[in-house]
């Protein structure tokens, strides 16, 4: 028989060990799950954009708030969430791991590694949705970001902190330009301290896994993966993860920007991102608008791209440069999403199928492409030769259309046409073969100065190969002087002699 003393002792222990703190949780119950959207009853204190946790550990984000229910987008497999499951509010916003530890890694839209390597230990996490820097915190674009592609660096220059859209039909070389730009940063990064390096982030949205694997292998082969983060939300991933991926990557890029470093981010592509958001919005029963997109599809991309900026010196002087990619249908740039992104960005690089099939690669339409702020970031040695090439090509395009209607062309016009054809040939460039600033200036200088006028158009590529080989082997000082913005009269005359010597051997 239990004595009264023992009972009192147990009661006393229970009272002493009682934790008086009351733990309050906002809890709801899943009513239905379909197409990646969970309808939950309860969660009265849930906030828009708040992360919630399901019973099995899967997370989601609140995107609709109704009287008695909330609609939650599930980040993960919907098969693991069932009717009647308990859902808890976390009182947190969506955040992802950021930092230098992620360089060289492949992660998913939640920041989890998917490359089969060990987990990374990052102490820093940043919210995926954050307000873009204000006007006072920014400064104008003043430093160039070299792509290594002649036609872009000379005619459509990109500066650090700029948003430059790459737009064109499928299979016109949009991704190739972005990957070439990432690979080109290797030579720059090898010459500067860590603070001045350009770190890169490539975001694959709705891409085939085979295509993404090919890009990762190319980055690894060229030694570019060591300063690059690859974020993947493939075609087999849910619409919610494809929607989240660009914001995840942008948060990772902001780590570099806000710590006084430089970062380049490629969104490939925002057309599929908009389609994923359209799918989510329709499933959330939001009213459709033009082309069935929701009314806030402009805000979807503007709040993402406005986070790319060149920060003021007070804020560390870091930069985040964005290269969003848009895929058009049959060259229609007046569609809803393309016009939205064109109006948000600081310029666009138009790629055309017709130019591509003519064999002009990269297939950039120089007449329609523009960079609104990048020209102020060009170095002087580039500006000296870039101005004359713009004029030459403008005159060539005008006369080319005119010459189609008649065979009789005066001597002056014929001279412009001949030089224009050689300049177009000179702007051709093979994929994965970026050129340094010095090499680009030397090649374009040869064309604009008339040294190629007597060379056959078919021999232009041969001339370029010989010139670059000669300069790299015997005159590296010329290339380094031009790259260091030191294109003096002495350098110009020495370069002219080298060009004349090679040109005369091909006449």
UniProtKB/Swiss-Prot annotation:
It comes from the Bacteria. Keywords: ATP synthesis, ATP-binding, Cell inner membrane, Cell membrane, CF(1), Hydrogen ion transport, Ion transport, Membrane, Nucleotide-binding, Translocase, Transport. Pfam families: ATP-synt_ab, ATP-synt_ab_C, ATP-synt_ab_N. The record marks 369 as: Required for activity. One of its GO terms (molecular function) is ADP binding. CDD domains: ATP-synt_F1_alpha_C, ATP-synt_F1_alpha_N, F1-ATPase_alpha_CD. InterPro entries: ATP_synth_asu-like_sf, ATP_synth_asu_C, ATP_synth_asu_C_sf, ATP_synth_F1_a_nt-bd_dom, ATP_synth_F1_asu, ATPase_a/bsu_AS, ATPase_F1/V1/A1_a/bsu_N, ATPase_F1/V1/A1_a/bsu_N_sf. ATP binds at residues 168-175. It is found in: Cell inner membrane. It is a peripheral membrane protein. It is an enzyme of class 7 (translocase). F-type ATPases have 2 components, CF(1) - the catalytic core - and CF(0) - the membrane proton channel. CF(1) has five subunits: alpha(3), beta(3), gamma(1), delta(1), epsilon(1). CF(0) has three main subunits: a(1), b(2) and c(9-12). The alpha and beta chains form an alternating ring which encloses part of the gamma chain. CF(1) is attached to CF(0) by a central stalk formed by the gamma and epsilon chains, while a peripheral stalk is formed by the delta and b chains. Belongs to the ATPase alpha/beta chains family. Produces ATP from ADP in the presence of a proton gradient across the membrane. The alpha chain is a regulatory subunit. This is ATP synthase subunit alpha. The lineage of its organism: Bacteria, Pseudomonadati, Pseudomonadota, Alphaproteobacteria, Rickettsiales.
């Amino acid at each position: 028989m239990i004595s009264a003393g023992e009972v009192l002792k147990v009661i006393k222990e229970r009272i002493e060990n009682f934790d008086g703190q009351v733990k309050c949780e906002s809890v709801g119950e899943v009513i239905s799950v379909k197409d990646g959207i969970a309808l939950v009853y309860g969660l009265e204190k849930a906030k828009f954009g708040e992360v919630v946790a399901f019973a099995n550990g899967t997370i989601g984000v609140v995107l609709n708030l109704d009287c008695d229910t909330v609609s939650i987008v599930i980040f993960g497999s919907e098969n693991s969430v069932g009717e009647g499951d308990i859902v808890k509010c976390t009182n947190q916003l969506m955040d992802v791991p950021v930092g230098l530890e992620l360089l060289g890694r492949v992660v998913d839209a939640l920041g989890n590694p998917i490359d089969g390597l060990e987990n990374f230990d990052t102490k820093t996490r940043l919210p995926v949705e954050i307000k873009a820097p204000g006007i006072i915190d920014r400064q104008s674009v003043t430093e160039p970001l070299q792509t290594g592609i002649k036609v872009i660096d000379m005619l459509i220059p990109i500066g650090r902190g700029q948003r430059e859209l790459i737009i064109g039909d499928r299979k016109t070389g949009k991704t190739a330009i972005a990957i070439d730009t990432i690979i080109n940063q290797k030579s720059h990064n090898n010459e500067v301290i860590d603070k001045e390096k350009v770190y890169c982030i490539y975001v694959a949205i709705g891409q085939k896994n085979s295509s993404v694997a090919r890009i990762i292998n190319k980055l690894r082969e060229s030694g570019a993966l060591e300063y690059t983060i690859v974020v993947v939300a493939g075609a087999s991933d849910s619409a919610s993860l494809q929607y989240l991926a660009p914001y995840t990557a942008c948060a990772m890029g902001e780590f570099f920007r806000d710590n006084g470093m430089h970062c380049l981010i490629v969104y490939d592509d925002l057309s599929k991102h908009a389609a994923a958001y359209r799918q989510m919005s329709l499933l959330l029963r939001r009213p459709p608008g033009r082309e069935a997109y929701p009314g806030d599809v402009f805000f979807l991309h503007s709040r993402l791209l406005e986070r790319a900026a060149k920060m003021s010196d007070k804020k560390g002087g870091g930069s985040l440069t964005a290269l969003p990619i848009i895929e058009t249908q049959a060259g229609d740039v007046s569609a809803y999403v393309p016009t939205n992104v064109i109006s948000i960005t600081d310029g666009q690089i138009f790629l055309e199928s017709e130019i591509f099939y003519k064999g002009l690669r990269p297939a950039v339409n120089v007449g329609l492409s523009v960079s609104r702020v990048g020209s102020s970031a060009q170095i002087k040695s580039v500006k000296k030769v870039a101005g004359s090439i713009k004029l030459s090509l403008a005159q060539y395009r005008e006369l080319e259309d005119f010459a189609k209607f008649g065979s009789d062309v005066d001597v002056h016009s014929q001279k412009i046409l001949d030089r224009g054809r050689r300049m177009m040939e000179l702007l051709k460039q093979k994929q994965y073969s970026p050129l340094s600033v010095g090499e680009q200036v030397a090649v374009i200088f040869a064309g604009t100065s008339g040294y190629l006028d007597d060379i056959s158009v078919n021999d232009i590529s041969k001339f370029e190969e010989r010139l670059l080989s000669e300069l790299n082997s015997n005159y590296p000082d010329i290339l380094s002087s031009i790259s260091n913005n030191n294109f003096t009269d002495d350098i110009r005359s020495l370069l002219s002699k080298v060009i004349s010597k090679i040109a005369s051997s091909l006449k």
